[in-house]
Regions:
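Glycine- and acidic-residue-enriched helix-capping/strand-helix junction motifs
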Residues: 2-13
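Glycine-rich beta-alpha loop elements in corrinoid/cobalamin-binding modules
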Residues: 12, 19-157
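Radical SAM [4Fe-4S] cluster-binding motif and immediate context
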Residues: 161-170
Length: 170
């Protein structure tokens, strides 16, 4: 996308955003890649904007940068729940979680898993605890005893009609 004439959201990101949106949750999109933001601008944005949950992801080749981003989020907002998806966390979840300060790694398709995480946090007085996500499929985390936990894989999505038409106007 960088340098491309056509700047579009990745399909996966747009699908997750649409799914969260139609279930009544507000969010801000800060698309670092499409806007080619410098690290300093990203850090300033994070410093000046507090969120309960921050979700982000990339391909595994951006591992080092995603670790940096996670560190910056936790540096300014240690209680913010960080959820990381795509292959950067899903392909190497234990390595990623043990070597970053991220809270949750998404494994596989994210729409249902992310919504269930948000609902669990919302229903727990907006407080993240590992105990509230242990039964959610399609994720990994490090529990309070330092044990790596990977939950049951989410069953393949069978009917696209169960999902809303992707919105592209975010």
């Amino acid at each position: 996308r960088l340098g491309s004439e056509h700047k579009l959201l990745p399909v996966g990101l747009a699908s997750v955003m649409t799914y969260i949106d139609v279930h009544g949750f507000d969010f801000d999109l800060y698309d670092i890649d499409i806007n080619d933001y410098a690290d300093e601008k990203v850090e300033k944005f994070i410093k000046n904007n507090k969120y309960d949950i921050v979700m982000y992801g990339s391909i595994v080749t951006h591992y080092k940068w995603i670790k940096w981003l996670t560190k910056i989020i936790k540096q300014y907002h240690p209680k913010t729940t960080t959820i990381v998806g795509n292959s950067v966390s899903g392909s190497i979840p234990e390595i990623f979680l043990r070597n970053s300060s991220a809270d949750i790694a998404i494994i596989g398709e994210a729409e249902l898993t992310v919504l269930e995480i948000i609902l669990a946090i919302y229903n727990n007085n907006e407080t993240y605890e590992t105990s509230i996500i242990k039964d959610i499929s399609g994720l990994a985390f490090i529990d309070n005893n330092g044990k790596f936990i990977i939950t049951e894989g989410r069953k393949g999505l069978k009917k696209l009609d169960d999902f809303p038409m992707i919105r592209w106007d975010y």
